[in-house]
C-alpha cells in the first residue's frame, strides 16, 4: 500500500501577528506588509518608503 503524505491546512484570513517579531498589536496590513508599527518604522527605508516631513 502506498504512503499518503498529508499536507497542513492552508490558513485563510488575517495573519496572527508581525512576521518579523510576532507582536500582536499595531499591525500594518496595508500593501500586504503584516508588520507591527515598530518594525515598520525600523525597516521602512529598506522597503522603499520615504519620509517627506
From Swiss-Prot:
* A Pfam cross-reference name: Ribosomal_S14
Specify whether Nucleus is a keyword of the entry. Answer: no
What is the required cofactor set for this protein? Zn(2+)
What is the free-text note on the cofactor?
Binds 1 zinc ion per subunit.
Tell me which UniProt keywords the record has, alphabetically. Answer: Metal-binding, Ribonucleoprotein, Ribosomal protein, RNA-binding, rRNA-binding, Zinc
An example GO BP is: cytoplasmic translation
Q: Which residues bind Zn(2+)?
A: 18, 21, 36, 39
Q: Which terms in the GO cellular component ontology are assigned?
A: cytosolic small ribosomal subunit
| UniProt cross-references to InterPro entries, sorted A to Z | Ribosomal_uS14, Ribosomal_uS14_arc, Ribosomal_uS14_CS, RIbosomal_uS14_euk_arc, Ribosomal_uS14_sf
User: Under the GO molecular function aspect, what terms does this record hold?
Assistant: rRNA binding; structural constituent of ribosome; zinc ion binding
What quaternary arrangement does the UniProt entry report?
Part of the 30S ribosomal subunit.
Quote the NCBIfam families the UniProt record gives: PRK05766.1
Query: Which family is it part of?
Result: Belongs to the universal ribosomal protein uS14 family. Zinc-binding uS14 subfamily.
**PANTHER family, per database record:** 40S RIBOSOMAL PROTEIN S29
Q: What does this protein do?
A: Binds 16S rRNA, required for the assembly of 30S particles.
Protein name according to UniProt: Small ribosomal subunit protein uS14
Task: Please report the organism this UniProt entry assigns to the protein.
Answer: Thermoplasma volcanium (strain ATCC 51530 / DSM 4299 / JCM 9571 / NBRC 15438 / GSS1)
Amino acid at each position: 500500500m502506498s504512503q499518503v503524505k498529508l499536507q497542513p491546512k492552508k490558513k485563510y484570513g488575517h495573519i496572527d501577528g508581525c512576521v518579523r517579531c510576532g507582536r500582536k498589536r499595531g499591525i500594518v496590513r496595508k500593501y500586504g506588509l503584516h508588520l507591527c508599527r515598530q518594525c515598520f518604522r525600523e525597516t521602512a527605508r529598506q522597503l522603499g518608503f520615504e519620509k517627506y516631513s
